Every structure is written in C-alpha cells, then in structure tokens.
A protein has these predicted regions:
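A sensor for short, sequence-defined functional sites
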Residues: 22-636
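Bacterial Sec-dependent N-terminal signal peptides
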Residues: 1-23
Length: 636
C-alpha cells in the first residue's frame, strides 16, 4: 500500500508541474573569497537547494566536490537536511573521500562527497564548503605553499552567472588587497541577456571587498549546437594579472626554469634521423609534428608534484611515449629546438572563447614555431594524429597565448578556407532497362573531411571492409558491392584519402515505357560522416544564439548517369540558390541524349557562426537534404 501511495503521489506531482519544470531550485548560492598576498585564496561556499520532484531528490542524494589533492584542500563544514515537515537533520558525519573516476588522465583527482540519503519532494539541502588552492598544481612545498597558484601573487576566477537550474539569489564576494589592482568584467550581457548583476565595493583597510549579486537566474533554453554556456550566458571574469603579456612571460619562464625543453642525446639522435630527408623548413616542421602526434600516445600518468602548467621534460616524454596535451606539446617544442627552430609552448581554450580579462581561460596546450621570416605557425600534435594538418582546423576561430620571453598578446586562429576541407564525390553510373543501377562512385577528401572519411579505418583492419560497405549500404541497402579500392591508410600523409566502389543495385529506379523516376545515388548524402552540417535541424527559421559546426567545408558532387533510353522532358527538384560568405549552395541537372548529369556544390564557410548566418546556413543544409530525398522524373 505504501508503494502504491508513493507512486500515486509521484504521478500527481508530475501532472501538477509545468512541462518546463525544473527538478531542483537553488534558493541561494553564496561564495566568499579571501585572497592572500601570495595569491592563495580561501573560498567558502554556502548553498541551499530544494528538490522539486523525485528526479531532484535523486540528483541531490549525494553532494560532491571535485578536487586535486596535490593543489587544493577541500572540506564540508556543514551539511543539513531540511525536511519539508520542518525537521532538520545533520548529515555531516556521512562524508567520504574517493579517487574520482578517470579515463586517459590519471592524475589522482578526487571527489569528496556527502551521502544525504532519502529525500522527498520539498526537502532542502543546505551545505557549507571550504576550499583553498586552485585547479592545477605546479611545484609544491611545505604547508600552504602547494596551494599557492602557479602565477604567484596573482588571483583569477571565472564566475558563471548562469545555471541549469533556477537560482533565487547568487552572491559572489572577493576580498583582495587593494594594491593588487583587481580587474573584472561581465561578459555576454546585451540584447539577449540583461546581466542584472549588482556590483558593490567597499574599502576595508588595505583591502577592497567586491560583491556581485544577481537575483532570479533562470535556465536558458539552449538552441541545438549552440556555443558553450560561458560564450553565450553571463559570466564574470576577475584577475590581478595586468595583461596577457604578463601571463605569456610567466608561462615561458615557468617551463624554461623547470627545464621542460632540454633535448637528451636520444631525442637529438631521433630528430636527426627524422629530418634527414627534409628539403625545406616546412618539411621538417611537418615531419616532427606528425611524429609526435602519431607516436606519443594520449595518456596522462602523474609525475606527482608538478602537474598542471608545468610541461613534463623531454626525457620523461620520450621514454614513456605517452602524455596529455601539454606533454605532446612539450615533446614537439623540444624536437623542434633540437632541429634548430625557435619553438615555444602555448595555451588555448578548445571550443570556448577566451576574453580580454587575463583569467585562466585555458584547457589545452599547443606549440608555436617561428619561421625564419619571423612569423609564427601554430601546431597541435594532440589533435592531428592521422590528420593531414599541423593545426587542427576544428580549432579555427580559437584563442591562444604563446609563452614568449618578451611576452605576447592574446591571438585568435583564422578561418580555414572551406577548400582546405573538401569532400568530392564523383560517380559514373548506368540505369538498366529493369531499373537497376550499376557503376562506380568515388569519394576523395582533404583536411578535416579527410580525417572524417578515414574514420572507417579507425578500428581493426579486419573491420575495414565492413565499415566501408556500410557507408554505401546506408544510402542503398540493396547494393551489391563487387570491388572497393582505397588509398593506403598507413601512408595518409602522402595523399588525400580516396575510396572507390564498384557496385550494382537492383530495383534502383522506377521505370515503365514512358517514365523513369529515381534519385541520383551521389545526391543521397554518401559518406555523411564527413558532412556534419547535415545533422543540423533546419526546422527553426531563426536563431538567437551563435552556433558551431565541426569545421568549414566544401562539398562538390558530380554524377554522370547513362539512361536506358532518350527522354524529352526532365523534372527535377527546385531549390533556392544560396550565395553568402557564411554558406552557399548551387546545383544543376542537364540532359544530353541518353546521358543525365547531376552536379551539386555546398560551401560552409566557418566553424563558429553568428545567429545572422543561420538563414544562409539553414537553406544550404535544407537544399542538400531535399535533393537527397526528392527524385527526378524523366518522361518521353
């Protein structure tokens, strides 16, 4: 009976809640930060959260704090369970500390958690946490020394004034030494968002206390494929660092002082061996970048004190043949220097914007090499294994900072021309009197599109044939494949990928004495794995949020079809042409004798798009989808 009553109550509550109801509500979220002269910060967070339904109860059954024991100390100071009936339960005794689940990066990150136990809708969790330290470790010492941030004497923070759940009140307060000249700025406030953050400051002796308050934060209804929340919703950046040049000088110095880029005799010998056949400086850069990309496996094994901004030294990386992005970047810097280049480590933020306030807006380490003419070229050995690029164009329109002895300013990678990432499909086919189709179809690709096509080879060799056959059978399930030819995947640097299919497809077209109806095989979005724009939902006519695709791209399709007879009339799908720098589209059908030719071109000009680009982008995608689904009709 009790179970039935609980189920009945749950159903009633679900029916009573609006369709957009949130599972929990944050009643208040208050953070107080005190910064010391060294940059060490003491952070106290006080939250009270209400479970609105049983899903919220489940979500709040455990409260967790993620931290790195090498660089941060955390504790729960108070955890109370406020029952809806007014009873209050202290659950602070149920505190656990476990090593956090890890995949590919094994640095010993931990989770401190409190088991709340059973909750009912309407119950509230109130907890107070204390933290000192930072996200990344550098060089540790005694006592609080290991909790001082890498850029000693400086403080930075990124505070989201957005939430996935409703927040009735959010307060962020920081007490900083006035002499530190704390700088701050609110971002993403404008037409769509009125930040509505109240800012107060008071001077207390040699300190200035800044308080930022916002009431009634409501969750944003995100549009599909929108940018990261920190790029489109209100956030606060704070930093005592004077500018990006200072951060650049620090990043250069901390790794040079550690000796991250000193080549060992073994590394020098390997570099000499690799560049022996290079004819130009670009040859040497490409050879070394791809060697690091393909031979240093991505796996983060902790070196103990020193993880974070410090790049592992060359001896460790070359011996272990594994590491995370910073280790692969460090290995490449070392090898380039061993080859006589001026090379430097750099930091970037993958798939999220870096703003002008010099807070720690980085999640990825890369490499910069200086050419003889003084220009820099960005290299990313982490993102280009088996990719015919030196810097992944999936990172175009992305901010980065090079660590230089004289300092560097924040910069952004440029657009990569769509022609650098072409997908070309060429088919020669013949329709028989029985409506069958036979012939060949070839796909070639370059850049990021090349990598997407060659995804069929990213498995055991025994599975390659099945994967390639599947790509054709996705658009023609009845296809009988007689032969497949492809480029050597192990020698991917020598030429762009190319795969050719020879096939026959029974009952491909509808045919009678006077009419022939079919959709060209090449129009059916063959190898759509290389055309991520096709995964966009084109139903919405407008967008208010910027959005992102995998990469810029050019799709070119041509098919020559030999018909079983000559036809007088051709009826084909009508599409609206698109001519826009962000996206463009064109197609043609023409008939000569018993030959029909189909051609299509789709250009996607960016990785990151503005809402104003949606109309052209949407029409381009819709056109390609329509041609894939709409047949041509030929009559005599």
């Amino acid at each position: 009976m009790k179970c039935k009553n609980l189920l009945f109550s749950a159903v009633l509550m679900a029916l009573a809640l609006p369709a957009t109801a949130q599972h929990k509500t944050v009643l208040y979220d208050s953070t107080s930060v005190v910064m010391e002269e060294s940059g060490l910060s003491h952070v106290i967070n006080h939250q009270r959260v209400r479970a609105n339904d049983f899903a919220g109860c489940k979500e709040l059954a455990t409260v967790k704090i993620d931290y790195d024991p090498l660089s941060a100390y955390v504790e729960f100071r108070q955890v109370l369970l406020h029952h809806a009936n007014g009873n209050v339960e202290d659950v602070l005794l149920r505190v656990y500390d476990y090593v956090a689940p890890a995949r590919l990066i094994y640095w010993g990150a931990s989770q401190k958690m409190v088991h709340i136990g059973h909750l009912d809708p309407g119950d509230e969790i109130e907890y107070v946490t204390y933290r000192k330290g930072f996200t990344y470790a550098l060089l540790s010492g005694d006592d609080d020394e290991r909790y001082i941030p890498p850029m000693r004497g400086h403080f930075y923070d990124i505070v989201p004034f957005w939430s996935d759940s409703p927040v009735n009140k959010k307060v962020y307060q920081v007490s900083a030494l006035t002499a530190k000249n704390l700088r701050f700025e609110l971002y993403n406030c404008g037409a769509q968002f009125d930040c509505g953050v109240q800012i107060d400051s008071t001077v207390q002796g040699d300190r200035t206390v800044y308080t930022f308050t916002k009431d009634n934060i409501t969750p944003l209804k995100r549009e599909p494929r929108a940018l990261a929340n920190n790029d489109i919703q209100p956030k606060l950046l704070l930093s005592t660092s004077p500018n990006w040049q200072a951060k650049s000088v620090w990043f250069y110095g901390v790794n040079e002082d550690y000796g991250s880029f000193v080549p060992t005799p073994e590394v020098q010998a390997k570099v000499n061996e690799l560049v022996r056949t290079a004819k130009t400086e670009q040859d040497s850069i490409a050879i070394l970048t791809h060697w690091v990309a393909d031979n240093i496996r991505y796996a983060g094994i902790s070196m103990g004190p020193g993880e974070g901004f410090t790049l592992h030294n060359a001896q460790m990386n070359f011996t272990d043949r594994c590491g995370v992005c910073k280790d692969k970047a460090g290995m490449l810097v070392t090898m380039l220097r061993a080859a006589g280049f001026k090379a430097y480590a750099a930091m970037t933020m993958a798939h999220e914007r870096i703003d002008r306030i010099p807070a720690d807006q980085f999640n990825h380490s890369v490499c910069a090499v200086q050419h003889r003419n003084g220009t820099f070229e960005m290299l990313d050995p982490t993102w280009v294994p088996n990719v015919r690029e030196l810097w992944s164009s999936a990172e175009q329109q992305q901010g980065y900072l090079i660590g230089l002895p004289e300092g560097a300013d924040l910069a952004y990678t440029p657009l990569s021309a769509p022609e650098n990432h072409y997908v070309r499909i060429n088919a020669n086919t013949q329709i028989g009197q029985d409506g069958s189709l036979s012939g060949s179809i070839t796909i070639t690709a370059e850049g990021q599109s090349d990598a997407a096509v060659r995804g069929v080879f990213s498995c055991r060799t025994a599975e390659w044939m099945r994967n390639m056959e599947l790509e054709l059978r996705k658009i023609a399930p009845a296809a009988r494949i007689t032969k497949i030819q492809h480029t050597d995947n192990d020698n991917y640097l020598k030429q762009p990928v190319s795969i050719t299919y020879h096939f026959s497809i029974p009952d491909f077209a509808v045919i009678d004495k006077h009419t022939l109806i079919f959709t060209p095989l090449s129009a059916r979005n063959f190898f759509s794995r290389a055309m991520s724009h096709l995964r966009f939902d084109t139903a919405p006519e407008t967008r208010t949020q910027p959005f992102a695709d995998a990469c810029s791209r050019l799709v070119e399709i041509k098919e020559t079809i030999t018909l079983p007879a000559e036809y007088k009339h051709l009826h084909f799908p009508f599409v609206n042409g698109v001519a826009n720098p962000a996206a463009s589209f064109g197609c043609q059908y023409w008939m000569e004798g018993n030959t029909l030719t189909f051609a299509e071109s789709a250009l996607l000009g960016k990785r990151v798009y503005d809402p104003a680009d949606w109309s052209a982008f949407r029409q381009t995608v819709a056109n390609q989808k329509m041609l894939a689904e709409t047949p041509v009709i030929l009559t005599k």
